[in-house]
């Protein structure tokens, strides 16, 4: 069919049809019947207008080949075939110069002799059916409708056919020829059956009974009835000037609508100040694991037993010393806390039977690190409501921080593949319905792309730590319990592996409300030297605790092993969300699924297999200062997952605000990209709302810098 269209129609018509389809996101190579229909419709519109002129005396005449110098004006203005913006411009200018009522839909032609817009229809069905659909859709007495069919029938408003017999016969003959040409190539049947009805047929919908009473009760002020309100809404010209409309609606509103052009948006202003620091609850790219493969020791699966077994795999322990102190803390206490952990683990081993949990002795260093007895005493409100100068503490404004490069590196690392698999393919029952089959297939493909991703490791690590901490907080409220930070995975060969990242010591945890805080001290292994990016580790005290032998291409090298220690805190509600981090997998799967659905609806078949198996195709991943970054479908899956995981790891009020407010600016910029001529008012206020969220959070600052890259490239 596509070849036929390109042979049968004038190249200019073919090009216009391709442009029109692209504007609506349709592909002429796939929707070939639609392609043919658009070309046919364009050709009929051009033939309708051909040879018809208006002379100096404003009489309508037909000139097939005459004096090219005669002062003739085309009788018909052709609107069909122009892009939407241009088409509306032409329609508006005709309405302004002639005073004709503005149509609700873009018509095909304007007749300067009869002073009316014309809607041309070409149908493969009954002309009457099609005429009614058109009339129903445009609902305007003023627009003249003229329908042609491929069988030589026609129908027009009030049987007024506008053109002379001969001109109409030319059109009918051409349509009949197209039909015969299609039939001879075996294309006609498919073409005839593919015609759908007009897309926007609105029915008169009556509301009665309770719904009607509710509708009348919920009208805006100053409207007596639903009809009265409907009439007002229908008469509300969307393309009129909005300022006037706003003042019609309310006396208090005065907004100047400014057009949003490519030059309008400025980049977001990122804060100055010292570089931002790491604030996640556990180390990400800098974490180091002590691991055991194929664990089969006694008590395997009991965290404390697993932790001791992992600790025993390492032989390079040495006398710890502080290499990067915490600016504000009492650093010797952090050092003593680590020594206490080592000593108490040693004590456990000397016991006959290893206990399932370990509560640490309440030493001075731990009391200090866990803020024991530091919280002001809570007093019942009844006892102090008469105090005259009762007031809340003054709190300092947060200090601004600038974007540091480490957070982009963290994100890049989260998108990478590790050499272990972090999630198992869940056993789900047999598929029953076809839709379940597609769903399973998508889930399996997606799982294959993300199961080895570092972001998936972070999910499992987060789920484990939060579950263990919430359990201990409820089960051992008064104890300083030692909680190993553990994860489990499978190696490439399918062997099970248990990993120890370090330890947490929990403080007192009488958590009555969701937001009550439990303090904890985290101690995590790492090979990263904190002196390389000291700003990243502002909240940590870092010790050097051993030397690790690493296998490299040149043989074994010894690297210092560090312990990152800090005081931290969390709450029941944060732990609850942390335990549910697996949701990130679902969220990113749904985003991928909507991409597959978009592909499938264009091709009119399920594209899951092609989508994941066509390795040559690249997809947009995100914006960077270099432009739009592209990558394989696997990379897209992992990037979406990493974004979702970081939204969870770095959740904060700043992120909530930035996401909600920047989305508005994003939508405006996308509308401009799609040539929808957006208008805005109080753009300055929107910028203010976005920028008040850019304070010191590393993930928010990184998102803001990505947003600036998007603005720069999207509006070039």
Swiss-Prot record:
Record keywords: Cap snatching, Endonuclease, Eukaryotic host gene expression shutoff by virus, Eukaryotic host transcription shutoff by virus, Host cytoplasm, Host gene expression shutoff by virus, Host nucleus, Host-virus interaction, Hydrolase, Inhibition of host RNA polymerase II by virus, Manganese, Metal-binding, Nuclease, Phosphoprotein
Ligand binding (Mn(2+) 1): 41, 108, 119-120
Biological process per Gene Ontology, one example term: cap snatching
S-S bridge residues: none
Pfam family, one: Flu_PA
GO cellular component, one term: host cell nucleus
Cofactors (names): Mn(2+)
Gene that encodes it: PA
Residues annotated for Mn(2+) 2 binding in this entry: 80, 108
Cellular localisation: Host cytoplasm; Host nucleus
Subunit (UniProt): Influenza RNA polymerase is composed of three subunits: PB1, PB2 and PA. Interacts (via C-terminus) with PB1 (via N-terminus).
Enzyme class, spelled out: hydrolase
Family: Belongs to the influenza viruses PA family.
Function of the protein: Plays an essential role in viral RNA transcription and replication by forming the heterotrimeric polymerase complex together with PB1 and PB2 subunits. The complex transcribes viral mRNAs by using a unique mechanism called cap-snatching. It consists in the hijacking and cleavage of host capped pre-mRNAs. These short capped RNAs are then used as primers for viral mRNAs. The PB2 subunit is responsible for the binding of the 5' cap of cellular pre-mRNAs which are subsequently cleaved after 10-13 nucleotides by the PA subunit that carries the endonuclease activity.
Protein name, as recorded: Polymerase acidic protein
């Amino acid at each position: 069919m596509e070849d036929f269209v390109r042979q049968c129609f004038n190249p200019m018509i073919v090009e216009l049809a391709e442009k029109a389809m692209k504007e609506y996101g349709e592909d002429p190579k796939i929707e070939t019947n639609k392609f043919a229909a658009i070309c046919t419709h364009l050709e009929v519109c051009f033939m309708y207008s051909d040879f018809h002129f208006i002379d100096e005396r404003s009489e309508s005449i037909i000139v097939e080949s005459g004096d090219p110098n005669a002062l003739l004006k085309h009788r018909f203005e052709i609107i069909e075939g122009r892009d939407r913006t241009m088409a509306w411009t032409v329609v508006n200018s005709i309405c302004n110069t002639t005073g004709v009522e503005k149509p609700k839909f873009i018509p095909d032609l304007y007749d300067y002799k009869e002073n009316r817009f014309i809607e041309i229809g070409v149908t493969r069905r009954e002309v009457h059916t099609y005429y009614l659909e058109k009339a129903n859709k445009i609902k305007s007495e003023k627009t003249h409708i003229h329908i042609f069919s491929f069988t030589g029938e026609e129908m027009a408003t009030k049987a007024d056919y506008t053109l002379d017999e001969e001109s109409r016969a030319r059109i009918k003959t051409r349509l009949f020829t197209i039909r015969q040409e299609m039939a001879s190539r075996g294309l006609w049947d498919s073409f005839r059956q593919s015609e759908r009805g007009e897309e926007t047929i609105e029915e008169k919908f009556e509301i009665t009974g309770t719904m009607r009473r509710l509708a009348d009760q919920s009208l805006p002020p100053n409207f007596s009835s639903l009809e009265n309100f409907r009439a007002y809404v229908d008469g509300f010209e969307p393309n009129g000037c909005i300022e006037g409309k706003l003042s019609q609606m309310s006396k208090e509103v005065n907004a100047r609508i400014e057009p949003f052009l490519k030059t309008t948006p400025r980049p977001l202003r990122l804060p100055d100040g010292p570089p931002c620091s790491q604030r996640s609850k556990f180390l990400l790219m800098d974490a180091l694991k002590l691991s055991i493969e194929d664990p089969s020791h006694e008590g395997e699966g009991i965290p404390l037993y697993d932790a001791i077994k992992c600790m025993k795999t390492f032989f390079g322990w040495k006398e710890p010393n502080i290499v990067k102190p915490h600016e504000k803390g009492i650093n010797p206490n952090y050092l003593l806390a680590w020594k206490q952990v080592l000593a108490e683990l040693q004590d456990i081993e000397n016991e006959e039977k290893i206990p399932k949990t370990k509560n640490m002795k309440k030493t001075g260093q731990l009391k200090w690190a866990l803020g024991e007895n530091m919280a002001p005493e809570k007093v019942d409100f009844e006892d102090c409501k008469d105090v005259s100068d009762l007031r809340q503490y003054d709190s300092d404004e947060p200090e601004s921080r600038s974007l540091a490069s480490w957070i982009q590196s963290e994100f890049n690392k989260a998108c990478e593949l590790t050499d272990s698999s972090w999630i198992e393919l869940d056993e789900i029952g047999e598929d029953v319905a076809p839709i379940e089959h597609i769903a399973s297939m998508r889930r399996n493909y997606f799982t294959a792309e993300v199961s080895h991703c570092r972001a998936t490791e972070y999910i499992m690590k987060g789920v484990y730590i939060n579950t263990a901490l919430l359990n201990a907080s409820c089960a051992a409220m008064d104890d300083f319990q030692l909680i190993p930070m553990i994860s489990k995975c499978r190696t490439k060969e399918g062997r099970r592996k248990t990993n120890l990242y370090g330890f947490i010591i929990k403080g007192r945890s009488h958590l009555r409300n969701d937001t009550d805080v439990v303090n904890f001290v985290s101690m995590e292994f790492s090979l990263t030297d904190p002196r390389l990016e000291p700003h990243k580790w502002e909240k940590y005290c870092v010790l050097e605790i051993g030397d690790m032998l690493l296998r490299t291409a040149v043989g074994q090298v010894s690297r210092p092993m560090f312990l990152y220690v800090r005081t931290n805190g969390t709450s029941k509600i944060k732990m609850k969300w942390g335990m549910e981090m697996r949701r990130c997998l679902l969220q990113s799967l749904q985003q991928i699924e909507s991409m597959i659905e978009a592909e499938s609806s264009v091709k009119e078949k399920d594209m899951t297999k092609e989508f994941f198996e066509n390795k040559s195709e690249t997809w947009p991943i995100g914006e960077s200062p270099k432009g739009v970054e592209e990558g394989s479908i696997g990379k897209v899956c992992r990037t979406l997952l990493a974004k979702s995981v970081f939204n969870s790891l770095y959740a904060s009020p700043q992120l909530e605000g930035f996401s909600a407010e920047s989305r508005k600016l994003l939508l405006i910029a996308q509308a401009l990209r799609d040539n929808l001529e957006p208008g805005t008012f109080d753009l300055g206020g929107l910028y203010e709302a976005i920028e008040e969220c850019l304070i010191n959070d590393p993930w928010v600052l990184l998102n803001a810098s990505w947003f600036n890259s998007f603005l720069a490239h999207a509006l070039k």
